Curated annotation (Swiss-Prot):
Its main location: periplasm. SUPFAM superfamilies: TolB, N-terminal domain, Tricorn protease N-terminal domain. NCBIfam families: propeller_TolB. The keyword Cell division applies. Residues 1-28 form the signal peptide. This is Tol-Pal system protein TolB. The keyword Signal applies. The Tol-Pal system is composed of five core proteins: the inner membrane proteins TolA, TolQ and TolR, the periplasmic protein TolB and the outer membrane protein Pal. They form a network linking the inner and outer membranes and the peptidoglycan layer. GO terms for cellular component: periplasmic space. One of its GO terms (biological process) is protein import. It is found in: Periplasm. It comes from Rhizobium etli (strain CIAT 652). The lineage of its organism: Bacteria, Pseudomonadati, Pseudomonadota, Alphaproteobacteria, Hyphomicrobiales.
């Protein structure tokens, strides 16, 4: 097991840069209403941050984050008229209005005497002729990518009014080798596919990793010693432990929103039912009791309800129940079968995998089953996971043929599907909350 201390590797100081940097009220400046669904990407000019290669790299990551969201269209630098030489000074707004830059980002990256990096940025509205916001951050040089993600989040929030999702991690199953000799390891990475680190050595099959709300633990299923069990992995130390030594197979684990429980499936006598385990007392509570396969439980963000998959009606469908197991109600009624339900962090939607007509789709529906929408369909799409702002999903796709699965992201419009490049094949992604 490998140690992973990277969650505490960054030390960021955040603050307004000076009195001149205080943001003007947002209602006087450019905004982007993303509640309307599919929106036209906003043209935004992101200049190379001053002071060498590091500054240019930071601005490139910011631009890539914003472009991948589908809400922003970074303007090609060849169109820039003004060359920013002093990010503290007001830009020539007319030069940016000519190229229709609805927003402008300037900044610099410098190295302090103690070796730390200082990254600062300013966000401008050229058409209002005003600065919108500005911040500065301090960190160790190796964490420059994370600072870029934090800045991208700040820009996203200032313009959309909602939290971003760029300063996050994704835990997933990294797959390598042939189908006959496939090696599967738990891995973790930045949400854009960079900084991949292996968490297990690949000696045991691993499936369905899930983040804890505190970002410090992962629960997953492993076939260690040929015994399929649910485990807890401490990301800081690499220490792992079994979640309950049950006589049958345990699988499909997920944390409760408060991190105090793990909800999972337990297979006994040919049936699979859903249980919770209190992580402090280690007491278990049975929530379902059917002669069927009940699996893939997922809490609502307030912890009051649970969505899950069950074939009690003949084929897999999505059900919702209260957190104590009462009020079990089927909510999926379309053609085909439904699986892997997962509740949005916003509480308004449940994402799912749907199999119909020989193809697999990723879709969303409201918690009462209404408003079903398919976002993408292919040979085999599966395992949706939500970004912490509830605006984007990640999933894995297996194409027909001899290759392996790959990770993709897509927003709720279904029009912004993006490949998330990883060093090897990837499956079973799970998005972290925003980092701190």
């Amino acid at each position: 097991m490998m140690k992973c201390s990277f969650f505490r590797a960054i030390l960021v100081a955040v603050g307004l840069m000076a009195a001149a940097v205080v943001a003007t009220p947002a209602n006087a400046l450019v905004t982007l209403d993303i509640r309307k669904g599919n929106v036209q990407p906003m043209p935004i000019a992101i200049t190379d941050f001053l002071q060498g290669d590091m500054g240019a790299q930071v601005s490139q990551v910011i631009a890539a984050d914003l472009q991948r969201s589908g809400l922003f269209a970074p303007i090609n630098k060849s169109a820039f008229i003004e060359k920013i030489s002093n990010p503290d000074a007001s830009p020539r707004f007319e030069d940016w209005k000519v190229i229709n830059a609805q927003a402008l980002v300037t900044g610099r990256v410098t190295q302090e005497a103690d070796g730390r990096l200082r990254a600062e940025f300013r966000l401008w509205d050229p058409f209002a002729g005003q600065q919108m916001t500005g911040q500065q951050f301090y960190t160790q040089p190796e964490n420059w990518r994370r600072v870029a993600h934090i800045i991208a989040d700040a820009i996203y929030k200032q313009i959309t009014g909602e939290e971003g999702y760029f300063d996050t991690r994704v835990v997933f199953v990294s797959e390598s080798g042939t189908k006959q000799q496939r090696k599967r390891q738990l891995a973790i990475m930045d949400q854009d596919g960079f900084n991949v680190r292996m968490l297990t050595d690949g000696s045991d099959l691993v499936l369905t990793p899930r983040f804890s709300p505190n970002r410090q633990e992962v629960t997953y299923m492993s076939f260690a010693n040929q015994q399929p069990r649910v485990y807890l992995l401490q990301l800081e130390t690499g220490q792992r432990e079994v979640v309950g030594n049950f006589p049958g197979m345990t699988f499909s684990p997920r944390f409760s929103p408060d991190g105090q429980k793990v909800i999972m499936s337990l297979q006994q006598e040919g049936n699979s039912n859903i249980y919770t385990m209190d992580l402090r007392s280690r007491t278990t509570t049975r929530l379902t009791s059917t002669a069927a396969i009940d699996t893939s439980p997922s809490y609502s963000p307030d912890g009051a309800r649970v969505s899950f998959e069950s074939d009690r009606g003949g084929k897999p469908q999505i059900y919702v129940m209260n957190a104590d197991g009462s009020g079990q109600t089927r909510i999926s009624f379309g053609d085909g079968s439904y699986s892997t339900p997962v509740w949005s962090p916003r509480g308004d939607l449940i994402a799912f995998t749907k199999q119909a007509g020989g193809k697999f789709s990723i879709g969303v529906m409201k918690p009462d089953g209404s408003g079903e929408r398919i976002l993408t369909t292919g040979f085999h799409n599966e395992g949706p996971t939500w970004a912490p702002n509830g605006r984007v999903l990640m999933f894995f796709r297996q194409a027909a043929g001899a290759g392996g699965p790959q990770l993709y992201s897509i927003d709720l419009t279904g029009y912004n599907e993006q490949l998330v490049k990883t060093p090897s094949y990837g499956s079973d992604p799970a998005w972290s909350p925003l980092l701190e």
